[in-house]
């Protein structure tokens, strides 16, 4: 089995890229890419995932920060079960852009599994397509800001077919800078598949402001990760 993201990163480094960011927003820890580049200070891996206490592969805790000489380049945010749209978006926006600004990547490679969705049968996060789409659009903006628009977006896991279809459609829409409603009609040929039903945003998402990341009561996972990682980059930790 081949790791498509790792192969792409290796190719980029071999063809002139100096620094590459791998951003994994799947429900599972991005352990494969992290392990391959554990000792490489030129690759920054960021994984926002459900805690290994509850979900395979059982790794990806805040204290896992990279090998000798590459400390601070493995970033892990281990979330508890039941994390909501707003909590997840707050964590993503608090962690990712400050590190991108410091690391100054030549390329961003991101992995967008659909299993953080609340209907997924394996994971226990409580995200809607609306929140996931907001994150995808944010990655597109960050790629423009910090990587001269050089962004490779990959699909990933997901175990409910309509959630996968809607999530990946939103990834494509974000990469094309197109706004697409999460309630857009599925193709007629798919009508026999289970459907998500009402995809209304959870409370707070409609008014979510990424510039106002919670500071007074930051999420515990955010505190743990920033305390472990941010000092390596001269950034103030939360909490």
Where are the language model's segments positioned?
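A general "terminal functional-core" signal
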Residues: 1-239
């Amino acid at each position: 089995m081949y790791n498509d993201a790792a192969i792409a990163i290796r190719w980029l480094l071999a063809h002139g890229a100096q620094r590459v960011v791998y951003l994994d927003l799947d429900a599972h820890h991005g352990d494969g890419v992290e392990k391959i580049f554990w000792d490489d200070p030129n690759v920054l891996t960021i994984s926002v995932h459900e805690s290994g206490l509850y979900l395979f592969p059982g790794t990806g805790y805040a204290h896992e920060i990279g090998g000798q000489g590459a400390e601070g380049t493995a970033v892990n945010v281990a979330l508890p079960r039941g994390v909501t749209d707003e909590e997840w978006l707050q964590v993503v926006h608090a962690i990712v852009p400050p590190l991108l600004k410091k690391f100054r990547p030549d390329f961003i490679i991101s992995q967008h599994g659909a299993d953080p969705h609340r209907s997924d049968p394996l994971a226990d996060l409580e995200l809607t397509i609306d929140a996931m789409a907001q994150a995808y659009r944010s990655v597109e903006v960050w790629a423009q800001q910090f990587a001269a628009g050089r962004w490779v977006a990959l699909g990933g896991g997901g175990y409910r077919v309509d959630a996968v279809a809607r999530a990946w459609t939103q990834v494509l829409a974000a990469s094309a800078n197109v706004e697409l409603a999460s309630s857009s009609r599925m193709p007629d040929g798919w009508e026999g598949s289970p459907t998500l039903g009402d995809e209304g945003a959870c409370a707070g998402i409609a008014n979510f402001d990424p510039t106002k990341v919670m500071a007074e009561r930051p999420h515990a996972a955010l505190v743990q990760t920033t305390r472990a990682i941010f000092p390596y980059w001269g950034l103030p930790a939360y909490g």
